[in-house]
Amino acid sequence: RFLVISNQEIKEALKPSCWNQPQITDCSHFTVLLSLDERWFESGSSYLEASFARKAGNNPDMQKKVTEVFENFIRTDLRPSVAEWSVMQSYIASANMMTAAASIGIDSCPIEGFNYGEFFDTLKSGIAEFDFEGYNVAYAICFGYRANEQTKKLRMDLSDLVTYVE
């Protein structure tokens, strides 16, 4: 789930829990990525049922197979907890969002490592129109146009990062 926050008062309230990073209030769109907690992935949940129905094209036999494969994955192959896996899934979305923004000239700044408890409490108290039940904060991204030219990034040499196996 994505919360796109342009309300300046809410951004001001969230800023202290993000170590007062100026991007929080300077950006035009502060996007919070919410991950799903374990209850969404319990066998028979309406979320899973709807998801599996979409994947199976509303074919009941195919839906049963998809359900069995996913439940086996949850039981046997999933190394972190379901909640941690859900957070990792949000990183895929965030990478795509940031790449898409860059491709059209919009800057972005990922925000993590903040005080998650304080941040989440502030979100819940400041946004009445969303039911936060069953969600956790995964990550946040500031989107907008930079005011000043960015300093040159220091990158590792490609050979220090990539090993080719032929």
What do the PLM-derived regions correspond to, one by one?
Residues R1-E166:
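Acidic, surface-exposed loops and disordered segments
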